[in-house]
Curated annotation (Swiss-Prot):
Name by which UniProt lists this protein: Small ribosomal subunit protein uS8
Gene3D superfamilies in the cross-refs: 3.30.1370.30, 3.30.1490.10
GO process terms (BP): translation
Stated family: Belongs to the universal ribosomal protein uS8 family.
InterPro entries, per the entry: Ribosomal_uS8 (IPR000630), Ribosomal_uS8_CS (IPR047863), Ribosomal_uS8_sf (IPR035987)
Pfam families: Ribosomal_S8
UniProt source species: Methanotorris igneus
UniProt entry keywords in alphabetical sequence: Ribonucleoprotein, Ribosomal protein, RNA-binding, rRNA-binding
Function: One of the primary rRNA binding proteins, it binds directly to 16S rRNA central domain where it helps coordinate assembly of the platform of the 30S subunit.
Domain of life: Archaea
Amino acid sequence: MSLMDPLANALNHLTNCERVGKKVFYIKPASKLIGRVLKVMQDHGYIGEFEFIEDGRAGIFKVELIGKINKCGAIKPRYAVKKHEFEKFEKRYLPARDFGLLIVSTSQGIMTHYEAKEKGIGGRLISYVY
């Protein structure tokens, strides 16, 4: 059986493991998109270290949890957002102003909505975390 949305599955699994109180969990299958989203979350202090483990197939990410995530998830459909429209989606997906992140895929790579606003570029919404 193939997964329809590996990113949504990984983020849902991350939220569930965080609620249960696990310290380490594994994401299978791994992908570049999931790795880049994990890197953004690590840079902003939501997860600890993570590493890619080669298993002869798609690979596995081993992720250390530090108890900072209340909720995270994929945004479906992947809305196209212009540089001045981020506030509308902040109100929809984040619980309060300046609390949490929207992760955006832009022409310059995957980044937070704060970085995209700062650079003056739009993109497609991928996920949220707070």
